[in-house]
Structures are given as C-alpha cells and as structure tokens.
C-alpha cells in the first residue's frame, strides 16, 4: 500500500488538533515561535526515549524474558521516560519571562507532546501491516494522549512559577505524576488485547477526552487571566477604563470592532485589534511580574512589560486620535460622571509616557 496518505494523516491530524488548541489562546500570550521551539523539543525527545526504552528492555529481558520485559517497558518504563523527556524543554522554558501563565504551559506542553506523537506515528507505520488502520487509530487515540499528558505538565509548570518554597516543586511533581498516570493507564488499556471493538472505542475516548480536558484547563486559565486583566489594566500602565472594558470582552471583539472596519477601513480595524491585544499582553505581564517571587524572573517580566508599553503607544498612534475616540465609545465605563469621562478621555488620548509631546505627535501624524 502507498505510505504517503497514511503518513500524511499521521502528521496532519495531530497538527490540526494542535492548531485547535492554540486558537484558544485569546490574548496570544505565547508566541508561535515558542510553540515551534517546544515542538522541536518533542521531536528530539523521541530518539532519546527510544534509546532509553530499548536499553531498559534489553536489561529487563535478561531476567524476565522478552515478552514480560516488553510489557513492562510499555506500561511502566515508557510512560516515565517519555513524559520526562517530552516536557523537559517546557519545564526549562517556564523560567523565561516569555512564559506568562499556565495557559501558555498547556499549549506548549500539548505542542511538545504532539510533535513527539508525529514522529512516533511515522515510526510505527514502518512496522505496520495495515498502514491506514494504524494511522487513523493512532491519530485519534495515542497522539492525543501524548499531547494531553504533556499539557498537564505544562499547566503544573505554569502554576509553579508563582508558588513559593516547597509548593513550587510539589506542583511540578504532581503535574508529572498526573501525566505519567494518564500515560500508564492508556498503555495498559491498549496492550491488554487486540485494538478493536470496545477497546478501540475506549482508546479513542481517552484521546478525545484528553483534548477536552486540555481545552477545559485553558478556559480555566483564561478565566483567571481575565481576572488578572481586571486588576492590572488601569491608568497606571496607560490603559483607559473604556479600553480595559473592551479588552475584557475579547470573545466579542470581532463584533465590537466591525463598525471600525466599516467607518475607518479594514486596515484600521486590524490596527485596533493589534492595539487591544498588546494591552491584554501588557496587563498579563504586569500581573505576572507582580506575582513573581524570583528577582531575575521579576526583572525579566518587568522588562517585557516596558517593551509592550512602548509598542502599545506606537500602536495607539498608528490607530489615530479619531479612531481611538471611537474605540473608547464602544464600551463606556459604568458609573462614570460626565467630568470623570472627560478627564479620562483627556488623559488617555495620550501615550503612557511623554504625554504632551505624544499628543502633538498624534495630531501632526
């Protein structure tokens, strides 16, 4: 049978699920570059895991026999080795200021696990008799399990960033143990007999259930991030009440910004969305910096927040005064008096730094 179609399915279907999960990151706090970097970590984890699993099999086979050793590796050794190797880069990257919260961790972990699964799918296709059945079965079961298990580690790593003392390490260990437990249970299921009938349905259920769990965790994280934005988006960082209210209604943004496209053109609509996304990212970085306990991490987050603030001011100038006034009229703050509203608009039409000269630049440019 031609291997091209099964191989394509083995790679593209997991990639499609990764894209689905990635699209849940409303504020795009995790860059696509970092997603690709974590995928490279997942790709590199496969040959490392293969060497370690093979070594464990050869050692165990001397005392247990080949069949028992193979089962032990699949159900005990491999889940430990693969979960540690898949998410090692994610755990390392979590110490960098680019990593904001566990929403990033879930997406980065899912990316690493998905890349690992892609290579593993291709490896198993080289040994399969029915290539199409092997490919389809794996992309809806094993591949999704790999991504979801690694996402659990990413969530734990993201929460551990803001823990203190032993709680940080406890969170990380619990995340890895949870991933290993999911992986072990799945491998025990699929190695208990032929992959058909009820067992196949259960395996697919575990895979799809893992994706649903990952999406639920991301939505939980987005809910917490929305709370962060309510606390951090204020005049102290150059964000008006109206702009803050609009950012917090991000799910409705396409509808809310549609009149801008109609009145000012599609280019201004894109610029407005970019401006509001930068505000959201600034709010998240500001809150993360406030929560960070390590001085180096705190300094890195504050530096990123300062850079985002400059980009936000540039984006505000690109949007222009008249369009900004329209944006602020979309979601008026509750309870503002006329004078409060006027004061807010006079203050917030200016960049966060250099207000007088920023206003002149806006008017001239």
Regions found by a protein language model. Name each.
Residues 1-365:
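Hydrophobic alpha-helical segments at protein termini of multi-pass membrane proteins
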């Amino acid at each position: 049978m031609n291997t091209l179609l099964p191989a394509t399915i083995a790679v593209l279907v997991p990639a499609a699920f990764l894209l689905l999960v990635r699209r849940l990151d409303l504020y795009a706090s995790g860059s696509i570059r970092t997603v690709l970097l974590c995928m490279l970590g997942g790709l590199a984890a496969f040959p490392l895991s293969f060497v370690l699993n093979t070594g464990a099999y050869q050692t165990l086979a001397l005392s247990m026999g080949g069949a028992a050793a193979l089962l032990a590796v699949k159900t005990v050794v491999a889940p430990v080795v693969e979960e540690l190797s898949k998410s090692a880069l994610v755990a390392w990257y979590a110490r960098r200021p680019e990593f904001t919260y566990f929403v990033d961790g879930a997406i980065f972990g899912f990316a690493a696990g998905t890349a690992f699964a892609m290579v593993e799918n291709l490896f198993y296709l080289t040994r399969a008799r029915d290539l199409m059945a092997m490919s389809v079965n794996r992309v809806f079961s094993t591949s999704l399990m790999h991504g979801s298990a690694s996402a659990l580690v990413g969530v734990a790593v993201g929460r551990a960033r803001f823990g203190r003392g032993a709680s940080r390490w406890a969170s990380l260990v619990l995340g890895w143990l949870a991933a290993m437990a999911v992986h072990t249970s799945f491998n025990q299921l699929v190695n208990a007999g032929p992959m058909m009938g009820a067992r196949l349905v259960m395996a697919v259920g575990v895979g799809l259930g893992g994706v649903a769990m990952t999406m639920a965790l991301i939505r939980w994280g987005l809910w917490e991030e929305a709370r962060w934005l309510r606390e951090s988006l204020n005049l102290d960082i150059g964000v008006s009440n109206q702009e803050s209210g609009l950012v917090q209604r991000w799910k409705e943004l396409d509808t809310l910004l549609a009149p801008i496209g109609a009145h000012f053109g599609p280019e201004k609509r894109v610029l407005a969305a970019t401006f509001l996304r930068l505000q959201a990212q600034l709010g998240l970085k500001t809150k993360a910096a406030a929560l960070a306990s390590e001085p180096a991490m705190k300094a890195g987050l504050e530096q990123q927040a300062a850079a985002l603030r400059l980009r936000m001011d540039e984006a505000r100038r690109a949007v222009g005064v008249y369009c900004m006034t329209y944006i602020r009229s979309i979601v008026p703050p509750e309870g503002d008096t006329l004078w409060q509203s006027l004061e807010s608009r006079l203050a917030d039409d200016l960049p966060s730094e250099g207000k007088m000269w920023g206003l002149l630049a806006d008017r001239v440019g």
